[in-house]
Amino acid sequence: MSTKQITCRYFMHGVCREGSQCLFSHDLANSKPSTICKYYQKGYCAYGTRCRYDHTRPSAAAGGAVGTMAHSVPSPAFHSPHPPSEVTASIVKTNSHEPGKREKRTLVLRDRNLSGMAERKTQPSMVSNPGSCSDPQPSPEMKPHSYLDAIRSGLDDVEASSSYSNEQQLCPYAAAGECRFGDACVYLHGEVCEICRLQVLHPFDPEQRKAHEKICMLTFEHEMEKAFAFQASQDKVCSICMEVILEKASASERRFGILSNCNHTYCLSCIRQWRCAKQFENPIIKSCPECRVISEFVIPSVYWVEDQNKKNELIEAFKQGMGKKACKYFEQGKGTCPFGSKCLYRHAYPDGRLAEPEKPRKQLSSQGTVRFFNSVRLWDFIENRESRHVPNNEDVDMTELGDLFMHLSGVESSEP
């Protein structure tokens, strides 16, 4: 069986890229009736020549009412005045149809009745000349727009879509720095802003000028604050490693570790290493190595912050950032966080509900220290008892036995 007897399904949809070299048939006589555009038969296919379906009309023998539609105007509603907001696309016939070829048609936007009102009958002058491609002359308030204007304006009035014409719109190249067209540019070159030194100020729009000057001033103040903070951080030396923090070899180490209750200078890596020491008690490792003031947490920062108000803002931003991360100890309700309500991380269940902060309980130990814990479990008590540090009296006993042995041997210890 030859493939030329099979209709190309890509050609039926209008997307065959093989063209005349296709191995399948490109004869529309073998195509199915479903490939005919039903919107074109109704007279208002918005795709026009770009439609993938066939813009052909059945003959009069195939259907009486449908066949006569090919010789009539697509829709009588196009000739009746309606509100300009109700707009659709209509196809104007430009040439006679040849079998096997797609007609070339021009897409024109017309007013269309969408309110369900009774439509006027077709004028006799239009029916008398079915092959004519002439259209009724639209009135000034029904001026047809192009398809591109309809896309830009959202099928609304073109003049209402933009507040300025091309001559009143600012040139984007001049606003970015330089326009190669110069004085020949069709767009408007704005005035130079005194802060950013760019041509971004519209000469005829005072509101745009005020808005840009406000944004530009806020940006300028923010950049100045960063410059002052960088200048104040250049000579800061870490009190542990005794190196200038911003002059370290690794870029990851050029960060400050700011203590919440202290103003001494440390780099982030050194103060974290200090607070991770295991040979000291918790109050010692949480205190400043110089002034011994206890700080609950360390805030990483690119710049050095010494002012208390700035530090409070930095602490709040740090807490908000930590509050967005899930706590690895809580594990969405499966685990227990040892920090309780003091934890800075997010305690949330799998459904997104936040866990209510649990009040820690106090316990007085035999050594006189107060311990805080959230829950009491038997295994925690046993594990704590097994790991409790007991003073080693073996050295004391051996010293006493040695002194007793020396006394019995008649050897007197020399006094200083």
UniProtKB/Swiss-Prot annotation:
Polar residues: bias regions: 123-136
Region annotated Makorin-type Cys-His, chain positions: 193-222
Cross-referenced Gene3D superfamilies: 2.30.30.1190, Pneumovirus matrix protein 2 (M2), zinc-binding domain, Zinc finger, CCCH-type, Zinc/RING finger domain, C3HC4 (zinc finger)
Pathway annotation from the record: Protein modification; protein ubiquitination
Record-level Gene Ontology MF annotations: RNA binding; ubiquitin protein ligase activity; zinc ion binding
Region of interest (Disordered), residue spans: 113-142
Annotated EC: 2.3.2.27
UniProt keyword list: Cytoplasm, Differentiation, Metal-binding, Nucleus, Phosphoprotein, Repeat, Spermatogenesis, Transferase, Ubl conjugation pathway, Zinc, Zinc-finger
Tagged with keyword Nucleus: yes
ZnF locations on chain (C3H1-type): 2-29, 31-58, 165-192, 321-350
SMART domains according to UniProt: RING, ZnF_C3H1
Catalytic activity: S-ubiquitinyl-[E2 ubiquitin-conjugating enzyme]-L-cysteine + [acceptor protein]-L-lysine = [E2 ubiquitin-conjugating enzyme]-L-cysteine + N(6)-ubiquitinyl-[acceptor protein]-L-lysine
GO cellular component: cytoplasm; nucleus
Positions where Phosphoserine occurs in the chain: S139
Function noted in UniProt: E3 ubiquitin ligase catalyzing the covalent attachment of ubiquitin moieties onto substrate proteins. Promotes the polyubiquitination and proteasome-dependent degradation of RELA/p65, thereby suppressing RELA-mediated NF-kappaB transactivation and negatively regulating inflammatory responses. Plays a role in the regulation of spermiation and in male fertility.
Protein name: E3 ubiquitin-protein ligase makorin-2
Species per Swiss-Prot/TrEMBL record: Homo sapiens
Name of the gene: MKRN2
